[in-house]
Amino acid sequence: MLGTCLRLLVGVLCTVCSLGTARAYPDTSPLLGSNWGSLTHLYTATARTSYHLQIHRDGHVDGTPHQTIYSALMITSEDAGSVVITGAMTRRFLCMDLHGNIFGSLHFSPENCKFRQWTLENGYDVYLSQKHHYLVSLGRAKRIFQPGTNPPPFSQFLARRNEVPLLHFYTVRPRRHTRSAEDPPERDPLNVLKPRPRATPVPVSCSRELPSAEEGGPAASDPLGVLRRGRGDARGGAGGADRCRPFPRFV
């Protein structure tokens, strides 16, 4: 009886600790609240190359030979035969402009971000924009699709199961350890972040106008300044010549 109670107590403590840990470290995955098993990758290929459609954080769409966190997509059905494609990592919707170029957008537009899905006889799927009449394609050639004609290159896709480990979808939010010079003054009271003034030598003229002998004083009896020069050299020593050197001025 005592052993059973101890085991129950240990089980309760472990449950409480696990809940506390989960609350202290929240799930930062972009897949939180979504169905992990529904992630797919749209694969397209030609006789030479193959790609997976991926949506980057800046909205750029291109192809990658291997599955990445940016090629993981969520395809959801809207109307009958219409689907919406969303990047699992970037939360951007796959959209198309009037020229047939595809891009990732944070804002959903039913006219530009909804596609009609058709399955061809070879088992591949094509995604047609009902407004612009272009197929979703990773190729450069863009032309309006007409039923019964061959689709353009890199426009036929296969939905592949996700093989990217779940751990790769977890991103650590970077912490800011530096400050900017534009921060308020109370954050930098010693003005460490502000740029210091640069010292540049500014030429200073060392020439002086000799006093006139008519003014009286020491210059009347020593017009050439011989006695005054001697007293200056005796008082200042070798530093007398350094007084005429230009000092750097901070500009």
UniProtKB/Swiss-Prot annotation:
GO terms for molecular function: fibroblast growth factor receptor binding; growth factor activity; type 1 fibroblast growth factor receptor binding. The keyword Signal applies. Keywords: Differentiation, Disulfide bond, Glycoprotein, Growth factor, Phosphoprotein, Secreted, Signal. It is found in: Secreted. Glycans are attached at residues 171, 178. PANTHER family: FIBROBLAST GROWTH FACTOR. This is Fibroblast growth factor 23. It comes from Mus musculus.
